[in-house]
């Protein structure tokens, strides 16, 4: 284990030598193919990847989803078959059957090991078939669970058009006006109703990046609208043809998830955008910090955030009272751990350890500062953050500190439950709506569920969920 020097008041960083004990990053296909409606995802891997996708997303197979598996065979691995010809055949078939606006190739562990030159093949094939091909490497050797989305969005960031590349005003409106069209549905025509005062202040264009469900996108966009901030677009957009316009040196960008560090780097370095370093909008405190950081960067004075945050805390009073004084241990899986730990500390919980597969301190700087401030305000000891934790050592620490709840990946949940340790799957927080003011209750409800179950079992005279034989 390697310890890194920190101030006495800040988080204590350590790094162990464990592997990525996380869900496979190619699972990002599950939500991205639904988010980008005119896309097609082609996962290039072995039978193992196919089995994983069938198990993870098998319920969707009868709906003819917009993803497929390009299964590598022995001839591909030993280079007897021409990779270009095989991918050309598959992409032409996809074009004929679905005619998507973009095809996304997802590289896996096998394509990484045999050094398949997907980035070299894609531009030639793109010119030939006339459909953009985006290459994203989401192999489990180099990336943790949610970083699959990060690699896809980082690859798509370079496809965002500059203002001079958008030819017509109609296309410009299509790329910037999708959300406003949705919000104005059912309202009177502004031309007929007469001119209305502008709801927005004058500021530089803002693009938000991160894949969230449409209701959460609408909520966060409306929260910024209350501050007079117009969101120019989201990455990913609902359609590939609606990717946001990015102007070098002018456009500001902000992330909504802590695992999008490569996307942030791509937008900042390749596209020359101005990155706003923010806490992440998880919990009322994080959402307020996210809005305040964006307002400060754009020169907008925030208003009404004290009342808005207090309103949410009042609604969460019962959950906070239940969780206060209880302890939690994060084993590490989805890279949301630091933001979740900060919110749970604010709710009065004790966090023994935050395990995390990968930590980008520059991208999460504002989140770490908010975590430190939260600990100091509530008298919580400095949080121990362990990067790439070793599971054997973690289990010894769990036995030593005896937490009320362990938030862990699915692989470890049942073995820990069999040893009398209460667990919650971290993957549930990835797929649930936990961002923004109004969804804070849903996250606390998920944290409460296994603890409520224990109370119910005790009322029946059971001490553990799994009975020893």
From Swiss-Prot:
Its cofactor is [4Fe-4S] cluster. Binds 1 [4Fe-4S] cluster per heterodimer. The cluster is bound at the heterodimer interface by residues from both subunits. It holds the Pfam family Oxidored_nitro. GO terms for biological process: light-independent chlorophyll biosynthetic process; photosynthesis, dark reaction. [4Fe-4S] cluster binds at residues 24, 49, 109. One of its GO terms (molecular function) is ATP binding. SUPFAM superfamilies: Helical backbone' metal receptor. Pathway: Porphyrin-containing compound metabolism; chlorophyll biosynthesis (light-independent). It catalyses: chlorophyllide a + oxidized 2[4Fe-4S]-[ferredoxin] + 2 ADP + 2 phosphate = protochlorophyllide a + reduced 2[4Fe-4S]-[ferredoxin] + 2 ATP + 2 H2O. Its EC number is 1.3.7.7. Gene3D superfamilies: Nitrogenase molybdenum iron protein domain. The keyword Iron-sulfur applies. Keywords: 4Fe-4S, ATP-binding, Chlorophyll biosynthesis, Iron, Iron-sulfur, Metal-binding, Nucleotide-binding, Oxidoreductase, Photosynthesis. PANTHER family: LIGHT-INDEPENDENT PROTOCHLOROPHYLLIDE REDUCTASE SUBUNIT N. This is Light-independent protochlorophyllide reductase subunit N. The gene is chlN.
């Amino acid at each position: 284990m390697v310890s890194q020097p920190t101030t006495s008041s800040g988080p204590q960083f350590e790094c162990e030598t464990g592997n990525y004990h996380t869900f496979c990053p190619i699972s990002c296909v599950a939500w991205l193919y639904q988010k980008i409606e005119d896309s097609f995802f082609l996962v290039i891997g072995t039978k193992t990847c196919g089995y994983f996708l069938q198990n993870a997303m098998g319920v969707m197979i009868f709906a003819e989803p917009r993803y497929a598996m390009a299964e590598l065979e022995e001839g591909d691995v030993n280079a007897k078959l021409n990779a270009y010809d095989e991918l050309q055949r598959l992409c032409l078939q996809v074009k004929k059957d679905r005619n998507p606006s973009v095809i996304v190739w997802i590289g896996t562990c096998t394509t990484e090991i045999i050094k398949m030159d997907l980035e070299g093949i894609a531009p030639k094939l793109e010119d030939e078939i006339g459909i953009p091909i985006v290459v994203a490497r989401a192999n489990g050797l180099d990336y943790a669970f949610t970083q699959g989305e990060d690699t896809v969005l980082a690859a798509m960031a370079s496809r965002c058009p500059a203002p001079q590349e958008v030819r017509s005003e109609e296309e410009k409106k299509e790329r910037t006006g999708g959300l406003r069209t949705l919000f104005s549905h059912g309202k009177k025509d502004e031309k007929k109703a007469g001119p209305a005062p502008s709801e927005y202040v004058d500021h530089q264009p803002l693009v938000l990046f991160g894949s969230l469900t449409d209701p959460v996108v609408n909520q966060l966009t409306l929260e910024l609208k209350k501050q007079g901030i117009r969101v120019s677009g989201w990455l990913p957009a609902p359609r590939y043809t609606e990717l946001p316009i990015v102007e070098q040196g002018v456009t500001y960008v902000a992330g909504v998830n802590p695992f999008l560090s490569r996307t942030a780097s791509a937008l900042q370095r390749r596209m020359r955008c101005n990155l706003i370093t923010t806490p992440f909008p998880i919990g009322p405190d994080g959402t307020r910090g996210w809005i305040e950081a964006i307002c400060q960067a754009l020169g907008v004075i925030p208003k009404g955030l004290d009342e808005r945050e207090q309103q949410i805390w009042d609604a969460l009073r019962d959950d906070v009272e239940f969780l206060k004084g209880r302890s939690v241990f994060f084993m590490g899986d989805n890279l949301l751990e630091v933001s979740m730990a900060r919110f749970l500390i604010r709710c009065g919980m004790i966090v023994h350890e935050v395990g995390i597969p990968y930590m980008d301190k520059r991208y999460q700087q504002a989140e770490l500062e908010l975590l430190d401030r939260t600990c100091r305000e509530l008298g919580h000891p400095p949080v121990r953050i362990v990067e790439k934790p070793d599971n054997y050592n973690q289990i010894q620490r769990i036995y030593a500190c005896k937490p009320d709840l362990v938030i862990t990946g699915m692989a470890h949940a049942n073995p820990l439950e069999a040893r009398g340790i209460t667990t919650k799957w971290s993957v549930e927080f990835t797929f649930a709506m936990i961002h923004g003011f109004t969804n804070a209750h849903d996250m606390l409800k998920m944290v409460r569920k296994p603890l409520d179950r224990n109370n119910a079992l005790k009322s029946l005279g059971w001490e553990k969920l799994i009975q020893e034989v």
